[in-house]
């Protein structure tokens, strides 16, 4: 898949996540912009770590293990995002990590739909 497709998928996932999160807590520009930057970075990070110069570029950063790690990371950070802000000392950082994991996760899910899929 091309970088542009990964970016569009990641940004769409981010807008859905930000929309759902806005029902629980107030989202301001102070957290929206870093979250958008984090999801853009996460959406292209697997291809930065493993440059797609050959047909064998899918290694550990494009694997099912990486997918499981990102599901866990997103799940934990997103769940803590639903707690009231005073309970989380670095709420914007946790939100940024969850957005990065969301972008990475959707990159891997998009790659999983291709013919080659994801390696073990």
Positions of predicted regions on the chain:
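N-terminal membrane-targeting hydrophobic helices
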Residues: 1-120
């Amino acid at each position: 898949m091309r970088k542009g497709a990964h970016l569009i998928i990641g940004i769409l996932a981010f807008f859905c996540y930000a929309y759902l999160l806005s029902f629980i807590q107030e989202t301001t520009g102070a957290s929206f912009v870093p979250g958008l930057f984090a999801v853009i970075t996460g959406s292209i990070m697997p291809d930065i770590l493993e440059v797609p110069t050959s047909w064998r570029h899918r290694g550990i950063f494009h694997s099912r293990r990486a997918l499981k790690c990102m599901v866990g990371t997103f799940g934990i950070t997103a769940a803590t995002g639903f707690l009231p802000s005073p309970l989380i000392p670095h709420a914007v950082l946790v939100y940024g990590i969850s957005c990065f994991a969301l972008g990475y996760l959707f990159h891997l899910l998009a790659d999983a739909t291709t013919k080659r899929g994801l390696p073990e």
